[in-house]
Amino acid sequence: MVSSNFYKNLGPRKLTAIIDFLHDIIAPPKIHEDIAIHDIKILQEASPNDISFLSNPKYSEFLKTTKAAACIVPKNFTGEANPNTVLLHAQNSYFAYSKLIDFFYAPIKSYPTKIMKSAIVADSATIGKNCYIGHNVVIEDDVIIGDNSIIEAGSFIGRGVNIGRNARIEQHVSINYAIIGDDVVILAGAKIGQDGFGFSTEKGVHHKIFHIGIVKIGNNVEIGANTTIDRGSLQDTIIKDLCRIDNLVQIGHGVKIGKGSIIVAQTGIAGSSTIGKYCALGGQVGIAGHLNIGDGAQVAAQGGVAQNIEAGKIVGGSPAIPIMDWHRQSIIMKQLLKTSNSKLKK
């Protein structure tokens, strides 16, 4: 349930206005102009004043019983629905839903153009126009922060860091040795630019390697809460434009992640590995060091990758193998287990 403590409902909205806002909607030819939509709800909870959406076919059964006034469905949806629910067909129903959220809701929390008194900002730092610097933020020498950026309470921006325009840095983020592009979001507790896990061993002693690389983050990147991105030991750690990195991800020193890649929670990428463009790594994936994951490759959740992956391939399991082989192995293991259990009973 959406709480009015945190978000302002901008409704009601006319259904015709919603259709115009979403642009690519295929709607019935005649819709009553006075239909008012007050809120967005899931199918099971929607009332006659609400709009809903369907993106996962396993929830299509709820369309028969929903009370929603309207529902956004996939373009090719032909299933049954409550005759009182107006179906709005979209090329991408989940994307349409994400746009609809912006149309209906705005956060109550606002950020004035202000540097709070408790913030410590070095004289040599450059703060752009229309920025908010929150309570107890520390910004060291020679930092550059672009226009319209937000740095929330308790964050630390180390010497020489460069952050682009329209950044949103949430609470208790630590950034060192980094150059960050425009329109970047970094969620609470993330740590960027610390030493990587690099040691040379001599006569039984592990000697720390001085890391002289940095972290480079492109434009329009989102980094999740409590994620850690180490700076390179010699080569830089690089996160390209449009990447989405979930919470609790560890990215080792010198890793390169290509444009538009998605990395899900609790994944770990060891040092000097390269992830191509538009790759997808599921939850709890492990990538060994010095590997190359080709463009568009996908790794299923909990996959353990110990070898290079060709572009476009989908793998799973540990050690990771082609996804269909992994499925076959799982089926065979179940069959062997049944056979073994049958023999034991005899």
From Swiss-Prot:
Q: What class of enzyme is it?
A: transferase
Q: Does the keyword Lipid metabolism apply?
A: yes
What protein does this entry describe?
UDP-3-O-acylglucosamine N-acyltransferase
User: Which family does the record claim for this protein?
Assistant: Belongs to the transferase hexapeptide repeat family. LpxD subfamily.
Q: Which GO terms describe its molecular function?
A: N-acyltransferase activity
Recorded hits in SUPFAM superfamilies, A to Z, give: Trimeric LpxA-like enzymes (SSF51161)
What reaction does this catalyse? Answer: a UDP-3-O-[(3R)-3-hydroxyacyl]-alpha-D-glucosamine + a (3R)-hydroxyacyl-[ACP] = a UDP-2-N,3-O-bis[(3R)-3-hydroxyacyl]-alpha-D-glucosamine + holo-[ACP] + H(+)
Quaternary structure (record): Homotrimer.
- Any idea which residues are catalytic in this one? 253 (proton acceptor)
Q: What is the role of this chain?
A: Catalyzes the N-acylation of UDP-3-O-acylglucosamine using 3-hydroxyacyl-ACP as the acyl donor. Is involved in the biosynthesis of lipid A, a phosphorylated glycolipid that anchors the lipopolysaccharide to the outer membrane of the cell.
Pathway(s) annotated for this protein in UniProt = Bacterial outer membrane biogenesis; LPS lipid A biosynthesis
Task: Print the keywords alphabetically.
Answer: Acyltransferase, Lipid A biosynthesis, Lipid biosynthesis, Lipid metabolism, Repeat, Transferase
Which EC number applies? 2.3.1.191
* GO CC annotations, alphabetized: membrane
Please give the organism.
Rickettsia peacockii (strain Rustic)
Pfam families in the record, alphabetically? Hexapep (PF00132), LpxD (PF04613)
What PANTHER family does UniProt report for this protein, alphabetically?
UDP-3-O-ACYLGLUCOSAMINE N-ACYLTRANSFERASE (PTHR43378), UDP-3-O-ACYLGLUCOSAMINE N-ACYLTRANSFERASE 1, MITOCHONDRIAL-RELATED (PTHR43378:SF2)
**Could you mention a single GO BP entry for this protein?**
lipid A biosynthetic process
